[in-house]
Amino acid sequence: MCSSDLCRPIGEPMFATAVDQNQLLALDDRPPVEVLNQLYGQASDHDKQLMQHSLFVGLAMRAGESTYGQGDYLIRNVIGADQDSGSIAVAAHLHPNQVVQFPLRDAKTSADDLRQVLGRLESALGSGTPDGALLFSCTGRGRGLYGESGHDSASFTETIGQLPLGGFFCNGEIGPVGGTTFVHGYTSSFAVFRPISSE
């Protein structure tokens, strides 16, 4: 099973130095709203537009890593901000000193990540041909993100080949991050079926 998200990180990873349940109170000892204002000031016009409606919080799910990359973060919604305290409310329970990075929802990044995930899946399959697959794609993808229907299923067929492919659109997809399974949003999750080897 594999998952593809659709976010591109902005800024640098930071530590959540103060949290209260789902409230992000400080990032590297700075108010998160201050950090976001700085990121906004440094952003391109395109990213400034995305930050107004497509900003998320990425939560690193493996502690103690020295570097984090695409697929290492659990992506969660920003559900509010308090201008007075500078805190941000996140749709997740937060942990002290958890690594956090802000990502933006972006169609190009999503398509690129999907190609990379499918490429890794193709390599993992080796010479064995799957019997079929399931695709569970978020309702926030498809035509609304890419401007066309069937993007993810077409990418799957292009990379893995013609095989029975079923599934449906979801509002929450199950897939791995950092070796643990989570319910995601805005992702496509694939499950591939093939015979068990007799060896």
Regions found by a protein language model. Give the residues of each.
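Small-residue-enriched flexible segments
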Residues: 1-133, 138-146, 150-163, 168-199
